[in-house]
């Protein structure tokens, strides 16, 4: 069964129109059993999302997108917490991100119980990233060879392609530029059905198998000790 990992919510500042209630409701209608949330550089929606998913009979997959510098290149790594300790490590990582830390090597001690996913377009041969590492692939990556196991990585930022204009407007506002200066928002970053996604990745069966194994290893036990990272009110907004 396909699991949607890389979904951005409205908590990804000016970069998504996905609200949690609609996301969970639609995911259930579209045949998902496991769904993820990977907001950019924060976990502010994580606990609420997880509780909402559980109440609707879905397995929550908690992660984040962290833009880190690896050998001078800025890479949007995806990080997935596999258990409570992984979730706590993600919270520590998010706190460091809010303080301005961006060097990949700095976070080596934070990656225990976390699956690291590198988008295929950012992969280069010989990259040394750690032990539990995957390459996030698109359907068009079929036939390519990578140094690490592959998993499907489909980004969701909106529910309809018509919402792309809203995303572009948000980007223009956040960048303080005119709409004509903003890069065109990619097509089809929407929530397809689980069946449609399995069909899209039919030429990458190893990616689907790896995804199923990865998701089956994810488990959280939520209690009052699992709290959210606080906003750093002294930090100014950065890209």
Predicted regions and their residues:
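N-terminal beta1-alpha1-beta2 module of alpha/beta enzyme domains
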Residues: 13
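Helix C-cap/helix->beta junction micro-motif
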Residues: 56, 146-148
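Generic beta-sheet signal
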Residues: 63, 136-138, 153
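Glycine-rich loop at the start of a catalytic domain that most often binds anionic cofactors/ligands
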Residues: 43-58, 164-168
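Active-site glycine-centered loops adjacent to acidic/histidine catalytic or metal-binding residues
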Residues: 39, 155
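Conserved active-site carboxylates
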Residues: 1-10, 19, 23-34, 67-136, ...
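Active-site-adjacent beta->alpha loops and helix N-cap segments on the catalytic face
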Residues: 16-20, 41-52, 139-145
């Amino acid at each position: 069964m396909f699991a949607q990992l890389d979904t951005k919510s409205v908590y990804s500042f000016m970069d998504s129109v996905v609200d949690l209630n609609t996301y969970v409701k639609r995911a259930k209608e579209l045949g998902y059993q496991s769904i993820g949330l990977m907001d950019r550089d924060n976990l502010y929606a994580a606990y609420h999302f997880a509780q909402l998913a559980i109440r609707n009979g879905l397995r929550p997959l908690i992660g984040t997108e962290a833009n880190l510098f690896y050998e001078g290149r800025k890479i949007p790594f995806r990080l997935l917490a596999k258990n409570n300790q992984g979730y706590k490590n993600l919270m520590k990582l998010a706190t460091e991100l809010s303080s301005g830390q961006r060097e990949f090597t700095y976070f080596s001690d934070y990656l225990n119980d976390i699956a690291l996913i590198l988008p295929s377009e950012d992969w280069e041969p010989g990259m040394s990233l750690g032990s539990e590492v995957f390459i996030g692939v698109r359907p068009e990556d079929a036939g390519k060879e990578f140094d690490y196991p592959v998993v499907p990585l489909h980004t969701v930022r909106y529910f309809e392609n018509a919402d792309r204009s809203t995303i572009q407007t948000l980007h223009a506002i956040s960048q303080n530029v005119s709409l004509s200066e903003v890069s065109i928002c990619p097509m089809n970053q929407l929530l397809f059905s689980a069946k449609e996604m399995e069909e899209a990745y039919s030429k990458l069966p190893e990616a689907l198998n790896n995804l199923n194994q990865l998701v089956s290893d994810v488990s959280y036990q939520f209690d009052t000790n699992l709290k959210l990272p606080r906003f750093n009110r002294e930090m100014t907004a950065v890209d």
